[in-house]
Each structure stands twice: as structure tokens, then as C-alpha cells.
């Protein structure tokens, strides 16, 4: 009973002293750690007084004097200070937990590291994984979390063509931009149209490139095919040429008036009996532009799937196919019950990332026809996907930065949500055996 009372008393004492970080550690005879914690606290307090309070105030007000206060800089600086403050709060909680834990160990008669040398050795031994990954976490904070927070805060403001700092101040407007996207007529119609085409584009282009990649891999890996190395090189050509050059070349080939498709390929087909094809409006008719985009992405994307599936096929034991042949299985049955499950099991995560990549595939949409032809409203073209619409919202004659930020967040929620569901449902992350 006395031992339990002593333990509780020591933990309470350490917790109270840890209200000022470092004092609890000093009370536990960990002088070096306590001084380090005090130094960190003092450094944060100094930073908070010199810069932090002003930055957090600026984040809340976004300035008060047009021409002098730069609202965007205040938002960015305040976000950075908010992250620094959150990191210190995590350190503060760790400080209390560490002090109480050490006090409990001492009260229980367990050995506690008190000298600087012992604590450094302990950190190098038990804390090596954390020290090794610390740079990655720091980079993640400033490369991922910081931009995401800035984007979120911009989406909650009225940052647009009429509110560009420092001449005009930015104001907080809450979730108005999100509500406008869903309920304001012009934005709602555009968002629905662009989102619908984005989904169609993602599903069609990605599925076709996956199917073509699997078919070509199966074709080349058949025993009766001779000159497999030549075929493998040929199928890699679309991947070897930079996508930028390929897209621009296709853009010229599909030109309505002087492109190779209308000027040479279609007339060549028209020499066949009973064939009379008119010139196709590849870049002036939205339907044919979308068709061309899907075909081009299929051409660009299938070599990657082909290479990946080829590796999987070569790893499948031949005995499985021999046993299936003895049992009388046809080629379709062997593919359905052996080949396809093996491919899906090994490549499902990569297949999912192909869909997420094409969902945000800005380059082909913009380079081929700049999102045209025609208009879907609110600055979007008839073939714009969400990511290219965001680009136009921020670079047009009347930029809408806050709306673009809101659409960016919606894209993130959609992609992350669908990806998490797909990854969770994928057997590639389970322990199931592929029969």
C-alpha cells in the first residue's frame, strides 16, 4: 500500500514539475535531459515572442491595412507558425509522459539513465529507428502537411482576382467556396460536367491500357512466338520516347485539316471497296477529341503494364499450366484460374495507382488541345479534367485561387478515399493464398 502511494506521489510530483518542461527530468536526476528540455522550451518561447504571436495574429486577421499588409504572406507565415506550435505541443506532452514514466521507474526500483553518456547510448540503441526516420518525418511536415494546410486555408478565403494582396486584403469566408461548387449554378454545372468526364476518362483510358498491356504480354510470352526480343523492344518504343514529344506529335497528327490521320490515313482506307470515310473533327468536336485522348493514353500507358505483367508471367511455375492442360483446361480457363489471379495478386496496388495517376493526368489533356474544344463554363473546356480546370482557374484572365484550392481538396478527398477502399479490398495486401 505504501509502495503504491509512493509511486502515485512520485508520478504526481513529476507531472506537476513538468508543467515547465525539463524540471520533471531534473527532479528525476536526469540533469542533461532536463537542461535540454529547458533549452528547447526557452528557444520556443523566444521564437513565439519575436515572431510567433505576430504570425498567429496575422493568420487570424489576414491584415488590416491594404497596401501594407500582405494577406497571403500572413497566411503562409501563420500556417508555418501553427505547425511549429503543434510540434512543440507534441514535445510538451512527451515531456510530461517521460517525466511521469521515469518517476514511476525510480519508485519501482528500476534502473534509470541519469548521465548524458548513458542517455546518448540508450537513444542510439533503443531509439535508432526513430532517429533514422526523423529526417523523413521532418520532410513530410514541410513537403506534405504544410502545403495541404495552406491549400485548406486558401480554400476558406476569398482569394481571387478582386482580392490580390497587397493592394487588396484577403478575408475569411468559411466554407462558401465549397458551397458555391455544389450549389451555385455556374460552378455546380461545370463541376458536375468536368467530374463526369474525369471519371469516364480515368476508367476508359486506364482500363484500356491495362487490357492492352496484359494482352501484349500474354502474346509475347506464348511458346509459339519467335523473335520475342524483337517484339519486346517494339512494345517498349512508346515508353522509350518522352511523353511530351509523343503527345505533341499526336496533336499534330490529329489536326483536322493537315494532320496525318485526316490527310493520309483516312484517304488510304477510302481506296478499299465500299469504304468512304469522311474527315473526322478530331480537335473541334468534343466527342472525337475525347476519343483521341483515350486512344493516345492507351498507347502511352500500356508499355508499363506490359513490362510489369511480363515479369509476373515469367515467375509463374510452368508446372501449373502443365497440370491444367492434363486436366483438360482450355486457354481461357487457364487464364481465368491461373494467369489472371496471379497477375492481379502481384500487381493490384500498381494497377490502382494507374487509375489515380490518370485521374490527375494534366499533361496529355493540356498538351493535346488545352482542354478544348468548346467550353463547359467557369473557364473549363469540354475535355478538361479536374486538374486542368484547376490550372485554368489559377492562370485565367480572372483567377479564382480560392475556388481552385477548394476543387484541389475535393480531388484529394476523392482520390484518397477511392484508393484506400481499393487498397483495402485488394487481396495483394492480405495473406490469402493464390490457388
UniProtKB/Swiss-Prot annotation:
The chain crosses the membrane at residues 35-55, 73-93, 136-156, 199-219, 234-254, 293-313, 337-357, 403-423. Belongs to the binding-protein-dependent transport system permease family. MalFG subfamily. SUPFAM superfamilies: MalF N-terminal region-like, MetI-like. It is found in: Cell membrane. Pfam families: BPD_transp_1. InterPro entries: MetI-like, MetI-like_sf. One of its GO terms (cellular component) is maltose transport complex. It is a multi-pass membrane protein. The complex is composed of two ATP-binding proteins (MsmX), two transmembrane proteins (MdxF and MdxG) and a solute-binding protein (MdxE). This is Maltodextrin transport system permease protein MdxF. The lineage of its organism: Bacteria, Bacillati, Bacillota, Bacilli, Bacillales.
Amino acid at each position: 500500500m505504501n509502495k503504491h502511494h509512493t509511486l502515485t506521489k512520485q508520478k504526481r510530483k513529476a507531472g506537476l514539475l513538468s508543467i515547465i518542461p525539463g524540471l520533471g527530468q531534473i527532479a528525476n536526476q536526469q540533469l542533461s535531459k532536463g537542461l535540454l528540455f529547458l533549452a528547447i522550451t526557452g528557444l520556443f518561447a523566444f521564437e513565439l515572442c519575436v515572431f510567433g504571436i505576430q504570425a498567429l495574429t496575422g493568420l487570424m486577421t489576414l491584415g488590416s491595412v491594404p497596401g501594407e499588409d500582405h494577406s497571403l504572406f500572413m497566411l503562409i507565415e501563420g500556417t508555418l507558425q501553427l505547425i511549429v506550435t503543434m510540434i512543440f505541443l507534441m514535445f510538451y506532452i512527451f515531456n510530461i509522459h517521460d517525466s511521469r514514466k521515469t518517476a514511476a521507474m525510480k519508485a519501482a526500483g528500476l534502473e534509470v539513465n541519469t548521465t548524458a553518456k548513458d542517455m546518448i547510448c540508450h537513444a542510439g540503441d533503443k531509439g535508432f529507428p526513430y532517429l533514422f526516420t526523423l529526417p523523413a518525418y521532418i520532410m513530410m511536415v514541410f513537403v506534405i502537411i504544410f502545403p495541404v494546410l495552406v491549400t485548406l486555408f486558401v480554400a476558406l478565403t476569398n482569394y481571387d482576382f478582386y482580392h490580390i494582396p497587397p493592394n487588396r486584403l484577403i478575408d475569411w469566408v468559411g466554407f462558401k467556396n465549397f458551397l458555391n461548387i455544389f450549389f451555385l449554378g455556374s460552378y455546380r454545372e461545370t463541376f458536375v460536367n468536368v467530374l463526369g468526364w474525369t471519371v469516364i476518362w480515368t476508367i476508359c483510358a486506364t482500363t484500356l491500357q491495362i487490357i492492352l498491356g496484359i494482352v501484349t504480354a500474354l502474346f509475347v510470352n506464348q511458346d509459339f512466338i519467335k523473335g520475342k526480343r524483337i517484339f519486346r523492344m517494339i512494345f517498349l518504343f512508346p515508353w522509350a520516347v518522352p511523353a511530351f514529344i509523343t503527345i505533341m506529335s499526336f496533336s499534330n497528327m490529329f489536326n483536322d485539316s493537315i494532320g496525318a490521320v485526316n490527310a493520309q490515313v483516312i484517304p488510304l482506307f477510302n481506296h478499299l471497296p465500299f469504304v468512304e470515310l469522311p474527315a473526322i473533327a478530331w480537335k473541334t468536336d468534343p466527342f472525337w477529341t475525347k476519343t483521341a485522348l483515350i486512344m493516345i493514353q492507351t498507347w502511352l500507358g500500356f508499355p508499363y503494364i506490359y513490362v510489369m505483367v511480363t515479369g509476373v508471367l515469367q515467375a509463374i511455375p510452368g508446372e501449373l499450366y502443365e497440370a491444367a492442360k492434363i486436366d483438360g483446361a482450355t486457354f481461357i480457363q487457364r487464364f481465368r484460374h491461373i494467369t489472371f489471379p496471379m497477375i492481379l495478386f502481384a500487381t493490384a496496388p500498381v494497377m490502382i495507382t494507374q487509375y489515380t495517376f490518370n485521374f490527375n493526368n494534366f499533361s496529355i489533356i493540356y498538351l493535346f488541345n488545352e482542354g478544348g474544344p468548346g467550353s463547359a463554363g467557369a473557364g473549363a473546356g469540354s475535355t478538361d479534367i479536374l486538374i486542368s480546370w484547376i490550372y485554368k482557374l489559377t492562370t485565367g484572365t480572372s483567377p479564382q485561387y480560392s475556388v481552385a484550392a477548394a476543387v484541389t481538396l475535393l480531388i484529394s478527398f476523392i482520390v484518397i478515399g477511392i484508393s484506400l477502399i481499393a487498397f483495402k479490398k485488394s487481396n495483394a495486401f492480405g495473406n490469402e493464398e493464390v490457388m
